[in-house]
Amino acid sequence: ENLQPLGGRAPEDDTSDERELRALFSTIEAERDAARAKAQRVVLIDLHSTSADGGAFSVVPDSIPSRRLARDIGLPVILGLEERIEGPLLTWLVSQGDTATVIEGGQHDAPRTQEVLRDGLWVALSHVGVLPEHDERVDRARVLMRSSCDDVPGVLDLVYAHVIDGETGFQMDSGWSNFMPVALGQRLA
């Protein structure tokens, strides 16, 4: 989520989405502060699905604990994507010294998406010590997570993103999904 609109504005000027975001942010801050008061580790797993078809992946900020968590979850990790998003929650949390990762589970209505998100949580719970490393649910989740992305490298670095203006009428050609190899000069849209 983009936290930037909340900065410097009075709550009474918020849109309904901003009010919801402000309430969520307030809850996260309160939980984080309560955990810190007990000297507990703070970890955020931000679960998402997309409108587009494609494989699951993790997004992490530039933080070693966050990257370790994302790698343990077992999905491809995309480095640099969080830098293209304005004001993401995970970047803010990591700047506060906490651990955070996004799990992008897949397309909204795809049956596998819920499984990926659930399995990612099982592995994350084990990673932070809430569940034992060899819990049956965690073992099963690790196998399923890794099998869902066999043909994709474990870590990818986003080096270029072409911004598309909504006014251009841009339309991708059918048949493409994330992580598909593209040859130089090959038509995409």
Residue ranges: model-predicted function:
Residues 1-189:
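Structured catalytic-domain cores with a bias toward divalent-metal coordination
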